[in-house]
Curated annotation (Swiss-Prot):
Name used for this protein in its record: N-acetyl-gamma-glutamyl-phosphate reductase
Species of the source: Geobacillus kaustophilus (strain HTA426)
Annotated GO CC locations: cytoplasm
Pathway assignment: Amino-acid biosynthesis; L-arginine biosynthesis; N(2)-acetyl-L-ornithine from L-glutamate: step 3/4
The encoding gene: argC
Gene Ontology MF term list: N-acetyl-gamma-glutamyl-phosphate reductase activity; NAD binding; NADP+ binding
Alphabetical keyword list: Amino-acid biosynthesis, Arginine biosynthesis, Cytoplasm, NADP, Oxidoreductase
Active site: residue positions: C148
EC number: 1.2.1.38
SMART domains: Semialdhyde_dh
GO annotation terms (biological process): L-arginine biosynthetic process
Role summary: Catalyzes the NADPH-dependent reduction of N-acetyl-5-glutamyl phosphate to yield N-acetyl-L-glutamate 5-semialdehyde.
Catalysed reactions listed for this entry: N-acetyl-L-glutamate 5-semialdehyde + phosphate + NADP(+) = N-acetyl-L-glutamyl 5-phosphate + NADPH + H(+)
Locations listed in the record: Cytoplasm
Entry-linked Pfam families: Semialdhyde_dh (PF01118), Semialdhyde_dhC_1 (PF22698)
Length: 344
């Protein structure tokens, strides 16, 4: 199997390269760039200097059309321009950007501030929240990989929403991410002196992942209302913790909550539901494709609390992309992803 990565000089692209380089079914993994040609990836990431042939190539449709699958780990706007031509040529595309996540182009343009991809391809794209969309992923030609925050949030909410157990207008999500979630481009906001020993909120009420989360919730339950969603930058490299609050329609015991989630995620190799009274930490999924979930119910307030943690570069990006790629190719979804978290 021959694959290509566009955008291998960013954090998600580098993680993709690491995973695909060691994938049991991938014999060749080439890298492409819109800004560099003939430069070895090690110029950006010295840790891959021992990999022969990891030289960046210029973006060309004809060259990319020769691959079985092409991954886009690019900023918004790139895949929207290039992916349709590849799809038309029968190449399977896995897009890690947000260009194909939203079905309504006007909504994309409102939240991303740029022109949307052609409507035909927005409708054709399959949303790759793997655990809840396996059958569609298996048939996908254009796969839209979920964002990091939506992955943690939606995996945490799905059983409650699908079973109709929470009030539709009551969801509050308090999400925190490591600095790698802001990307590799240098900026004041991610400067060491600004991030170290500091926690800060950002994109209050305007984060582009809000409509993505709401769109999916409404496909599960048309009565779902807008959510309250806040994001914070934490002084760590990797990891997302989404702490989710929602008002239960009826009292539910912690044991029943845990049983619901374990049943919902039975057969999902990367979802680990904690015992009653136990809650996950980001360190416990570091470097892995796992999503760990802890649950509680407060009898005083009638609220359910869900704690969902992932590695933002793995389950929140490259790991989930490979999980979807596996299904698209007819393999076991866990191929190349079985590594346990790195600890400590």
């Amino acid at each position: 199997m021959n694959v290509a990565i566009i955008g291998a000089t960013g954090y998600s692209g580098a993680e993709l390269f690491r995973l695909l380089h060691g994938h049991p079914h991938v014999s060749r993994c080439d890298v492409f760039s819109s800004s560099q040609d003939g430069v070895h990836v090690s110029e950006s990431f010295p840790h891959v200097g021992s990999v022969d042939g990891a030289v960046l190539h210029k973006l060309e449709i004809e060259a990319l059309s020769r691959y079985d699958a092409v991954f886009f780990a690019t900023p918004p706007g790139v895949s929207g321009e290039w992916a349709p031509a590849l799809v038309d040529r029968g190449v399977k595309v896995i897009d890690l950007s947000g260009d194909f996540r939203l079905k309504d182009g006007a909504v994309y343009e409102q939240w991303y501030g740029r022109e949307a991809a052609p409507a035909e391809y927005l409708q054709k794209a399959v949303y790759g929240l793997t655990e809840w969309n396996r059958e569609a992923v298996r048939e996908a030609v254009l796969l839209s990989n979920p964002g990091c925050y939506p992955t943690a949030t939606l995996l945490g909410l799905a059983p409650l929403v699908k079973e109709g157990l929470i009030q539709e207008d009551s969801i509050i999500v308090d999400a925190k991410s490591g600095v790698s979630g802001a990307g590799r481009k240098a900026g004041l906001g991610t400067h060491f002196s600004e991030v170290n020993e500091n926690v800060k909120i950002y994109k209050v009420n305007v984060h582009q992942h809000i409509p993505e989360i709401e769109q999916t919730l409404q496909t599960w339950n048309e009565a779902m209302e807008p959510i309250t969603f806040s994001t914070h930058l934490i002084p760590m490299t990797r990891g997302i913790m989404a702490t989710i609050y929602a008002k239960a329609k009826q009292p539910i015991s912690p044991n029943d909550l845990v049983d619901l989630y374990k049943t919902s995620y039975e057969g999902s190799p990367f979802i680990r539901v904690r015992k009653v009274g136990q809650f996950p930490a980001t360190k416990e999924v570091y470097g892995s494709n796992y999503c760990d979930i802890g649950l509680a119910y407060d009898e005083r307030t009638g609220r359910v609390t869900v704690v969902s943690v992932i590695d933002n570069l793995m389950k929140g990006a490259a790991g989930q992309a490979v999980q979807n790629f596996n299904l698209m190719m007819g393999w076991d979804e866990a191929e190349g992803l079985q590594s346990l978290p790195i600890y400590p």
